[in-house]
Amino acid sequence: MNGCDEVDTIRDAVEKALQKCDVCMAGNIISREGLLRAYSDFVLSTMEKEKHNVGMILHTGSACSACFDVLLIVCAALSNILYNQTATDDVIASLTPGDKVLYYSGKEKTRAQRYTFCGFVNSYDDPPSDKIGELILLDQGKNGKTYLMKKNWSGIVPYFGESASLDGKGIRKENGKRKSFFCDVLGMKDSEIPRTIDTSTVVVMSKEDADNILNRLTFWFSNMKVGLTELVPISYYTDADQEYPYGNNPAKTEPVIKITGKVSVARSLLLDRSGNRNIGLMVLGDEAVRRGESELPELIERKSLQYVYLSMPIGSESSEKMVDCYSSAAVFACTKDFLLCNYVNAAISNQETDILNAQIDAIIDKEITTIVLPSLINWETYKEFKNAMYFIKSEEYSTDKKDEFIIHAYSLMKLFMTAAFSIRYMEKLIDDSELENVIKPDERLTQITEYSHTFPDCLKSKAETIINILEIAYLSFFDKNPKEKALKELLEKTSATHIAIVVPKAYYIKLMQRVLSEDEKLCNRDWRIDIVTANRFDNSNMYDLIIAIGNITGNRFDILRCQASKNITAILYEAEKHQFHRNEKRFKSVEHMLNQRSAIHVDDDYENESSDVDESEIATVEKIDDELSEYFDSVAIKAVRNSADYASRRNVADIVAVAKFDTDEVAFFTKNYKAYVLDDLEHTIKEVPADSIVEGDTIVFTRSNSRTRDIVEKLLRDMITNNLVSDNVKVAYKQSRRWKTVLIDYMNNTGSTPVEIANQMIKNGVTVQEHTIKSWLDEEAHTVRPKKLDSIQQIALIAGDEDLFDHAEECFAAGGVIYKIRRQILTAIGQTILGEITGNDEQLNPITTTIADRIKESAVVVQVESISFVNDTVPLNSINRPISID
């Protein structure tokens, strides 16, 4: 272990280092905060406690997750430096004559140049040898030879870059801050400062979060500041062999911190036995944990890893499950009791710590208020409805009309329990075409009544019970809605200026906006009200007040776990109250479990409260809801299989995911499909692979009568046809498609498979995989051009197309032009759709203006209500688009 006294552990060494410097985000010191000091101590105390250590970190929330993630990455980077066993002698011994190296010359060793390592000599007259001698001979071609004595060997670093030039071009002179950090903070001698480090940590986190941290993270010491990327090489990996470096890494040495957005890529990096020894894995963020759930157990249990940390907000859906799964894991959980025992006032007030302390206050001072309203649908009636639904679902009698009956009846009850508007008002907006893809409740009632007429006698009684209850609810809420009245009264009384109203479905947003804007007492208030679905709730915002219109939970919102406000109110009917209180009891039980598991002692006063209704009744209703949700997924796949094509296994496609939208439509996604997902923060559209789509995502499709499912392609073709783009773009569009046309024609004529094409390209020296060829061919993948020019050249060579080979550079450049305009179209779509949603229709650029009307004609915007990942097949004509299951 370099730079430490022999008795020091890694923990002691890193603790000493953190005492000698401040860790900052955008110049704001964060490492002096009491909670973050306790957190750093937890990480360092568990990092090397055993040969294999697992830690679960449940921090205060998304708004301040960067503070926790920063310190975790800092601990990883510093521990890698200190675990490093590579000495100068090891570096020199690894060199072979002919290897490229960098040599850092001068007293401060801050300037590097490229050389060829020739070998060792004992005198200037000796021929070089691979046996270690007194001098090293470096050759720099025209610039001559250099002989180095042993005292200068520490300035030699293997060079793994692609530059063939033997000089210092493109290599920036170091500013000396790296050396100062290693000496002043880590206590190393000049000769101990490593140029190469032989261990790495793999980190799973989003590219956006990684950029946010690494672009802002600095250390302050001795009146200097230095970034983490100046101390150790760090790279982001989109695939195991696709690396994008952060900062400067002139020798192109292996990264010490390897970041990726996917657990599958992290697995590949960890299994790679060449190069550095991987000592740790960190998975940061609820989405990263949730998406990698199936692959994480294998990695967490890898005994070769010194440490594994999973970090997520304490309010996340995954937190309880992960802590429960790993009973021996060390736990750092920011429960209310933990914070009361360990939190002290802010050490420094700045932008970062203020957010952290606001989130801490939101946990400690959080007050959840329930407004319980009377309703004709009481608990007994609600139970009767659920039991009748379960009875019909469980009967062996199976028809499409039975499936439709269950789906529509379930949706109607959900509407009646959560609506904060009258049914009359809702149906008026539907009649006025202000709500698209929403069926009027009275039409649904008529439909399920007609479906029930086809049922056998054994089901008719239960069906009548369901219909009668729904008709009572329909009439009860037709003219007036108790939740609407309670919501308005609450808003009239509150002094809050930033409010979130959480609703279950996206179409509620427009309804609620209209309802509130038409109220004279509310419309002129100076406040900001965000109306969001539970699946689109942004926990990184901090609100004065959050109002949930019912016992609503989603992928990104849970009333009891939410840390985005001190004040949360749930407006409930009596039938919802019992499930809500059961959830409260469950939440308190989980908090008690986390306090008991905490690595830092926590006192709490947990008592198991009694309920005013039979717990088994509530459990039965919850079980029915769970089984009905599973039933809906199976109904969707079964419905689309009722076709002649599927029966004969003709024209079928493999699917990897089934999504259900807030329109009650579904979509079946194939492996290579990339969805156009609305990014309301960036005001643009992102292309998201099928396996990365999550609940709450808003996806933009073309309308079902379009010839192409790619809305960007449709709009671009339309703009070309109507002369709305320049002649250069028209020419580029034609040229950009040529490589793909040549490849498809060649494969059709020769019967070549993607694997055969990949093998031919590999033989010719171009690294490519079978799935890459498949994604080129798949129009759903939206591939405009290959990533590298030589791929187009290889396609031309394989197909024997000399003209394409001669014009490969033009074809590649044309692809760049089209890629750029596609990105502009995506941004324009995002701006236009967000303008529709927010009412701000300001056109920000000419393309937005050009396509605004066309988007309204071409686009369908839906929100993912739920998504499940499968391995199945469906008819080809039902993939990658929203369809109704009739």
Residue ranges and their predicted role:
Residues N2-Q113, S123, S129-I132, L137, ...:
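Helicase motor interdomain insertion/brace
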Residues G141, N175, M205-S274:
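Inter-Walker segment of RecA-like/P-loop motor cores
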Residues K763-K787:
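Recognition helix of helix-turn-helix/homeodomain-like DNA-binding domains
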Residues S752-N764:
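Short alpha-helical "recognition helix" segments of helix-turn-helix
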Residues V289, V515-A619:
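Conserved RecA-like P-loop NTPase helicase motor core
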Residues H52, A93, Y606-N728, I795, ...:
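Preference for solvent-exposed, low-hydrophobicity sequence contexts
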Residues K787-D806:
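DNA major-groove recognition helix of helix-turn-helix/homeodomain DNA-binding modules
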Residues K252-T369, T381, A575-S589, L594-S598:
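Signature of the SF2 helicase/ATPase Hel1-core->accessory helical subdomain module
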